[in-house]
Amino acid sequence: MKPTQWLSAVVSLAALALPATSHAFPIAATGTGLKVLVGSTSDIIATYQGNSASFSNDLYLMLDAGGDPGDDGNTSNDLFIFNNHGSAVGSTVNLGSFSIGTELMFRLHVNNTGYDFFTGDASRNPDGNAHANVEEDWLPDETLVSFEDLYDGPFDYNDLSFSFTNTVTTDPNQVPEPGSLALLGLSIVGLAGIRRRRQPAN
């Protein structure tokens, strides 16, 4: 093979490899607009998973003036976690522990445009669209969150991905519905009846 043919083959192979590596990090596949909730009393560890964004984005945990999770309208209270270009993939931040069922609201600040986008309901965002996918149990006991940083999309959620331990998307404190309780009660009554029938008569 001539050197020019060899060089051409190498360049062609490199070009084919580019699309495969453009998203060489996890992107949450489900959970558009879901909330991130505390699932246990253990510390919540955030891990930076990667991005393919051209814009520079900062990730914050929203806190109120007392340092508790929440949105009091003052972003200077928020805890900086990662920057999608400055943080190393795999880096971690311990966010501490919180009461089970507490919503952790995350804010993505887009440095290039000044927009802020949030986890949870679409109504929190300036364009009225959900800007985060939240995938519970992406890994065992770990939730994956992926953000979109552009106003009005394209909603490929590849602009900053991060994961958290000890978090869920359904409230662990949620009381079962009355129908579920009734079904459970009938099951217990049925088991008690079967047990009585099996007991020998005296």
Regions found by a protein language model. Give the residues of each.
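Bacterial N-terminal signal peptides that target proteins for export
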Residues: 1-8
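Bacterial N-terminal signal peptides
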Residues: 10-17
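Sec/Tat signal peptide C-region and signal peptidase I cleavage site
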Residues: 18-24
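Extracellular distal adhesion/interaction modules in secreted or cell-surface proteins
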Residues: 25-146, 150, 167-170
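A recurrent domain-boundary module in secreted/ectodomain proteins
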Residues: 150-174
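A short, hydrophobic C-terminal helix/tail in secreted or cell-surface proteins
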Residues: 176-194
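C-terminal membrane-anchoring or membrane-association module
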Residues: 192-202
